[in-house]
Amino acid sequence: SLQSRSIETLNLILNTMRLKDQDVVNAWELNERHYGALTGLNKDEMKKHYGEEKIHTFRRSWDNPPKPLKKTSPYHPLNIDIYKNIPKDKIPDTESLKNTYERVIPFYKKNIEPKLDENIIVSAHGNSIRSLCKYLFNLDNENISSLEIPTGNPLLIVSEKGNIKNARYLDKDRAKDLLVF
C-alpha cells in the first residue's frame, strides 16, 4: 500500500525481525477502499448524514459504494501527493468492496502469486485484505461482507504448491473466526 499505516506497519515488522535489505513494493492497488463522500467524516457525522443502516450497507455490502467524493475535495486522491504517479483514470471517486477486489486481485495475481514459494509479507488494510481473503478462500459475495478482519493481528497463510494448507491469526486472544481447515 502507499498509505502510511501499512508502510509503518511493514517497517515495524521488518525491524523487529531484523530483516534488512528486503525487496519492498509499495503499491496503490493494496490501499484501503476509497469511501467516497464518507472520507473525512467521523462516525457521528456519517450517521447524521446517511443513517446507521445506510452506513453499514456502504461499509459491508459487496457492490454498494457510497456517493462519490468531489474531485475538488482535499481528501480526494487526485489532490494527495502520494497518488501523483498513478494514472488519473485509475483513481476512483468512490469504491465498493467489489471495486476494491477488482483492484487488488489483478495486482495479487501478477505480483504476489508468482512468488508464493517465498516468504511474503503483505501489509495492507481491512478491505484490501478482505478482498484477498475472498479470492484465496473462495468466499461468496454474501459471506465476504461478514468476514471480520481484526486490525493489527497478522494473518499467517501457509501454502504449498499454490494450495492453502492453513490460515490463522497470530494473536489468538484477538482472533476472529476465519475458516476451518
Regions found by a protein language model. Give the residues of each.
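Short beta-strand scaffold positions
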Residues: 1, 102, 122-124
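Phosphate-coordination/substrate-recognition cap region in phosphate-metabolizing enzymes
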Residues: 1-77, 83, 134-158, 162, ...
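Beta-strand elements within well-structured catalytic alpha/beta cores of enzymes
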Residues: 25, 118-132, 157
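Amphipathic, non-transmembrane alpha-helical scaffold segments
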Residues: 3, 47, 97-105
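Surface-exposed cleft-lining segments at the edges of enzyme active sites
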Residues: 86-101
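Glycine-rich phosphate-binding loop signature in dinucleotide/nucleotide-binding domains
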Residues: 111-118
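Acidic, His/Gly-rich catalytic cores of divalent-metal-dependent hydrolytic chemistry
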Residues: 171-181
